[in-house]
């Protein structure tokens, strides 16, 4: 997996910031792992051109908010490279349904009929999974494939190069990345995960979306319009 791979495009600001990562042994091993998995007939999500969609949709200089997920959805047609988001025409997954419930409670935002979060990403919400690929029907299957050093570096880059961001850390996996974030520079908001297993243990009622926008406005930034159009 090299940054001149014709199938894998990376937005210019991220390519510059992450250039050294693509030459490191772990990244070469990761690329070889993915090639071998595909050669063995395994179905990998998301499709190759969408693996870096979070970075390509939200250039480094545009980042205002970071939401950290775990790995892509593992069902056909769901994942498109943005954490918690699904492609148009796909039913809204349970965790995202709870995110919408909290948005509705917190900011009175109508619940859309889809789970397509592209509009958030275009406004500066970096929707970053810590593993950028997964095997079909096998959640967490690429958790140890080598993505962690890469996505850790993404978090380090936004921590170092951006000012006054909001990091939304939902659940223990996302919160394990807190050590990469400077709390003097950025606002870190933590709660339970929006999964149905944990949403009622502190996610619903966390007020993270209004708190995010208040912080952005206090720091001279345009708040996020969290509303999404019906499709």
Swiss-Prot record:
Please provide, in alphabetical order, the Gene Ontology terms of the cellular component aspect for this entry.
Answer: cytoplasm
Q: Which Pfam families match?
A: UDG
Q: Which SMART domains match?
A: UDG, UreE_C
Gene Ontology biological process terms, A to Z: base-excision repair, AP site formation via deaminated base removal
Instruction: Identify the enzyme class.
Output: hydrolase
Reaction(s) catalysed (UniProt annotation): Hydrolyzes single-stranded DNA or mismatched double-stranded DNA and polynucleotides, releasing free uracil
Q: Which residues form the active site?
A: 71 (proton acceptor)
Superkingdom in the source lineage: Bacteria
Q: Tell me where in or outside the cell this protein is found.
A: Cytoplasm
The molecular function GO annotations come to: uracil DNA N-glycosylase activity
- Primary location: cytoplasm
User: What's its EC?
Assistant: 3.2.2.27
Report keywords, A-Z: Cytoplasm, DNA damage, DNA repair, Hydrolase
InterPro entries, per database record: UDG_fam1, Ura-DNA_Glyclase_AS, Uracil-DNA_glycosylase-like, Uracil-DNA_glycosylase-like_sf
Instruction: Give the NCBIfam families listed for this entry.
Output: PRK05254.1-1 (NF003588), PRK05254.1-2 (NF003589), PRK05254.1-4 (NF003591), PRK05254.1-5 (NF003592), ung (TIGR00628)
Q: What does this protein do?
A: Excises uracil residues from the DNA which can arise as a result of misincorporation of dUMP residues by DNA polymerase or due to deamination of cytosine.
Family, per entry = Belongs to the uracil-DNA glycosylase (UDG) superfamily. UNG family.
**What name does UniProt use for this protein?**
Uracil-DNA glycosylase
Q: Which organism is it from?
A: Pseudomonas aeruginosa (strain ATCC 15692 / DSM 22644 / CIP 104116 / JCM 14847 / LMG 12228 / 1C / PRS 101 / PAO1)
> What lineage does UniProt assign to this protein's organism?
Bacteria, Pseudomonadati, Pseudomonadota, Gammaproteobacteria, Pseudomonadales
Corresponding gene?
A: ung
